[in-house]
Design a protein with these regions (language model features):
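Low-complexity or membrane-interfacial segments used for flexible interactions
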Residues: 1-33, 39-41, 62-66, 75-162
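Short hydrophobic interaction/assembly module
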Residues: 43-74
Length: 162
């Protein structure tokens, strides 16, 4: 499966497309620990908890059952997801953070190329939860990078005003 996604500049919603047809979305509310995602009529909820060492639980919205979890590897831009006792690793594939992969036992199940307002993902699995989770992790690290930039540049900007 090959998906494209787009996100408007100040939007919290990623729209997912398959051959130009909308097939899902990932909605990330600002200042909320809960995000929702849907793909091919399957809906998932992502609940992030913790402060310095955050984790995310993945729920099937229809059954309200926990189907997986995500553990982040700090600022190293790597995450581990677990579904049914199977471990998956999400990681960037280049130093520009414009390509990432979602792997099981060193085999890439999902690969993606990013642009400023979207990207393209190729999935070698029919499990939609893996693809939507990989997109969620990508968004998590983009938000983390933005927060770090704000934390660094606001003091610099404030010092330059004085």
């Amino acid at each position: 499966m090959k998906l494209n996604w787009k996100k408007a500049t100040f939007s919290n919603t990623y729209k997912l497309y398959d051959n130009g047809r909308e097939v899902g979305e990932l909605v990330d509310k600002t200042f909320s620990s809960i995000s929702t995602g849907s793909l091919l009529n399957k809906k998932f909820r992502f609940e992030t908890k913790g402060f310095l060492k955050q984790t995310t639980d993945v729920f099937d919205v229809e059954t309200n059952k926990k189907v997986g979890s995500i553990t982040y590897n700090g600022f190293r831009s790597k995450a581990t997801a677990t579904f049914n006792n199977e471990t998956f690793v999400w990681k960037y594939e280049n130093i520009w953070n414009s390509k990432w992969s979602f792997n099981q036992r060193e085999k890439a199940l999902v690969t993606a190329t990013l642009s400023s307002k979207g990207g393209t993902a190729v999935s070698k699995t029919e499990e939609v939860v893996y693809l939507i989770t990989a997109l969620f992790i990508n968004n998590y690290y983009k938000k983390l990078a933005l927060a770090a930039m704000i934390a660094i540049f606001i003091p610099i900007w404030m010092a330059s005003i004085n």
